[in-house]
Swiss-Prot record:
It is found in: Nucleus. Residues 61-85, 373-384 have a biased composition (Basic and acidic residues). It comes from Caenorhabditis elegans. Its main location: nucleus. GO terms for cellular component: nucleus. Residues 359-372 have a biased composition (Polar residues). This is Calcineurin-interacting protein 3. Residues 1-30, 53-85, 359-404 are annotated as: Disordered. The gene is cnp-3. Keywords: Nucleus.
Length: 533
């Protein structure tokens, strides 16, 4: 039993007997693993000797002769120290090898997760899931994706693939070579020579020396094997550490590009139009958002980079809808995702929106939106009263629309038909002008008091996409059956939550944009009639 225990303690099989420490590094990312690598002490295999000093050589002469008993005690002491030093070195190397092996496995796992093949499969699967959910809950198909300016994912994956392949060619080259491999080769040759002459031993002393030499040589082989394995593992760690940092940087750039250009648009459409999705689809969308969350958004804020729209946009759903011609300048634009039922008004509302010239709005307006001349006049009065101060000497807008002045007594007589109140005793009749004559009489005076401005006849500057689009989502009155729509094709025209203006500070430009947004919503009702379920 003692010989078996001694053989197992010094054998090469005992090197792999220690348990791995992979559980402690399982949840670490690249940054934490890099900091952990810098804290590891590699002096156990990087230096020659770290343990107890060797015994004195035989060339060191003693000052005085000693007895045989004292010499045996000294020899036994040196042998115990030698054995203890070798065992301590083996235990230290085993612990170090177990630790760096766990770190290497975690680095390898992270590198495989960020490899080209894994990332491509995962991102393509997420994009496909989003497209399937939009097709399930809306009327958008693959053709609509091109019409609203969503690019292909392959354009971004090709850039990531090229950078990742160049990164994987890196290899760490340490300054000192692996000298333990050469020593291990020499020690194994000595071990084979020693065991070949085993049958030639006759005396007990030779057999004792053979057993001692074999045990010590076996321990040296184990130590050199451990140090060689630690050296190779440490080299792999330094290689994968650099590769992992570069792959993580490229992976974050890819996630940001895919989210801002493709998946953010899908997520916004899903949030706005999919009111009651299934639980499985909702969980799937949340997992997609969480995958891109660390690099593409902050809590409660999703950033979107919108690409310029094409010059000519045609709706694939209906051929009856007129053609819309949109001309945009190449100005980078950005918008902000808002959660459902949360709409903000931006204070910068100076950019006007042109009316498409090829649209016949009389055919697309609903009966509720057709206004009489008098109602249009009241709308113009409200627009002017928001920015211009009414002169104190002039009557209010509501007062200017009353009938011509008639004495109160006469009106009273007319209302109750009081013949006794009349001075002549006869019924008094009042000739009132008809509605058309009153309108013609009031309109010139109204134009003199408040100059009428034809906003549609004013010259419009060329339309461009500003850096922050005013966040207006038009709504339809409760009496109308038409659901609220967003202006097409710019589905995501919202602004940051911080840019909010009070309602009483709305400018005529904003009111003009409000009217045109409503007209555009009515025009595009046919394209999005299936989105509301």
């Amino acid at each position: 039993m003692r010989s078996l225990k001694r053989e197992n303690s010094g054998s090469a099989l005992s090197v792999r007997s220690s348990d791995s420490e992979g559980d402690s590094y399982h949840n670490m990312d690249i940054k934490k693993l890099t900091n952990k690598v810098k804290e590891i002490d590699i002096s156990a295999f990087d230096r020659t000797r770290l343990f107890n000093p060797r015994k004195q050589r035989s060339c060191h002469k003693r000052a005085e002769p000693v007895s045989e008993e004292h010499r045996k005690k000294e020899s036994s002491k040196n042998s115990r120290e030698y054995t203890k030093r070798n065992r301590d070195e083996i235990v230290t190397c085993q612990k170090l090898f177990s630790e760096i092996t766990a770190i290497m496995r975690r680095f390898k796992q992270l590198t495989e997760e960020m490899s080209v093949e894994t990332v491509e499969v995962k991102i393509k699967s997420m994009i496909k899931d989003c497209q399937e959910m939009l097709t399930k809950y809306t009327n958008l198909d693959s053709n609509d994706r091109f019409n609203i300016g969503i690019p292909e994912a392959e354009d971004f994956l090709a850039i990531f693939r090229e950078k990742a392949h160049a990164t994987m060619l890196f290899e760490h080259r340490p300054e000192s070579p692996n000298m333990y491999t050469e020593n291990l080769f020499k020690l194994r040759e000595q071990y084979h020579k020693l065991t070949d002459h085993k049958d030639n031993l006759n005396s007990s002393k030779d057999k004792t020396n053979y057993a001692s030499s074999k045990s010590r040589l076996n321990q040296r082989i184990v130590r050199e094997q451990l140090k060689s394995d630690c050296w190779v593992c440490w080299k792999s760690i330094n290689t994968m550490m650099v590769q992992g940092e570069q792959l993580q940087e490229y992976n974050n750039e890819l996630k940001k590009d895919i989210w801002n250009n493709i998946l953010a648009v899908y997520h916004q459409i899903f949030t706005m139009f999919c009111k009651y999705p299934e639980y499985a689809d909702k969980e799937k969308m949340e997992r997609i958002v969480e995958y891109f969350a660390p690099v593409s958004r902050t809590p409660g804020h999703l950033s979107v980079v919108w690409n310029p729209m094409p010059n000519v946009v045609k709706s694939p759903r209906s051929e009856e809808i007129p053609e819309i011609k949109v001309e945009y300048e190449e100005v980078p634009s950005s918008s902000t995702f808002l959660s459902n039922n949360e709409t903000t008004i931006a204070s910068d509302m100076d950019m006007s929106i042109d009316r498409p010239q090829s649209m016949d709005m009389s055919q697309t307006l609903s009966p509720e939106q057709t206004l009489s001349p008098r109602e249009k006049l009241q709308v113009q009065d409200r627009k002017i009263s928001t920015t211009q101060e009414t002169p104190p000497a002039l009557p209010s807008p509501s007062g200017t629309l009353t009938l011509p002045t008639v004495p109160a007594s006469t009106l009273k007589r007319k209302e109750f038909g009081d013949l006794l109140a009349c001075p002549t005793g006869k019924r008094v009749t009042i000739d009132e002008p008809n509605r058309a004559e009153r309108t013609e009489t009031i309109m010139p005076s109204r134009q003199m008091m408040y100059p009428m401005v034809n906003y549609q006849a004013l010259p419009m500057p060329p339309q461009s996409i500003p850096s922050m689009i005013p966040p207006f989502i038009p709504t339809i009155p409760s009496t109308s059956t038409m659901p609220p729509m967003m202006p097409y094709p710019n589905v995501l025209l919202t602004a940051a939550p911080g840019d909010v203006a009070p309602i009483d500070s709305l400018t005529p430009s904003f009111l003009r944009a409000l009217e045109q947004q409503k007209l555009m919503a009515a025009f595009l009702n046919h394209a999005f009639q299936k989105c509301q379920k």
